Amino acid sequence: LFGIDHRDKNTALGGENSDTIIIASVNNDTKDVKLVSVYRDTLLNLGNDTYSKANAAYAYGEAEQAITMLNTNLDLNISEYATVNFNALTTIIDDLGGLDMDMSYAEIVHMNNYCVETSEETGKDYTPIELPDRPDDIEAVQYHYHLNGVQATSYCRIRYTASLDMGRTERQRKVIQMIVDKAKSAGLSTIFKIMDDVFPMVTTSMDKTEILQMLPTLIGYSVNDTTGFPSSFKFSNVKGSVIVPTSLESNVIELHKFLYDDPNYTPSATVLANSQ
């Protein structure tokens, strides 16, 4: 799943960085879904031994290059994808009637700030949340609000709290989990409406008929575990502020343990070379 900061709603998706990169692993036997966010500033081989931030691969070669980057650096075999923008996400959430969210004071402040731009880009309205009295710990999650599409999308954009981009990606995975859970309880008629409303806003490797055939099975699946990649890293100023896996080899081993319950995975020669 790629998320694009796509400002011009009248042009096709492409040419922008994918500031959201989420890998979904679906186990059709257990009906379990695992999600892994690849941090956008992760230093990876984007192709031809060009090392840069992972989010730049989409801008260089759209989904094809971004998927190749993931497959070659992480020893994966991803073949399907979907790319969404702010408008698609706000529409999904509004069609579901919004989301109930527990938040910190800091998250409320930043969400309200992001809402201004998100509303302008999507053409959708929102009501700013009135700030409570400032607590001693502004990072403590202690407030509960019902968010509409603009607000929940803005919540997904927050990256200026103490948890930085790790917190941003965790919020995104949390919202996806909430969307899946609410869609399952909403029923097929709502799911099909969302499909009709959102599909024109999505770029995907799958056709609409294929997706429609899959939707009835959604109710049986659950997103049960999520994490971020890399799990072990350091910050560096190589080619800008980047996240450097320490090392790529060990992180790929941990990734395969998480995604596939494989405790004895041996990374490929390509991963070993990229890990140097």
Describe the role of every protein-language-model region.
Residues 1-276:
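Non-catalytic, solvent-exposed segments at the cell envelope interface
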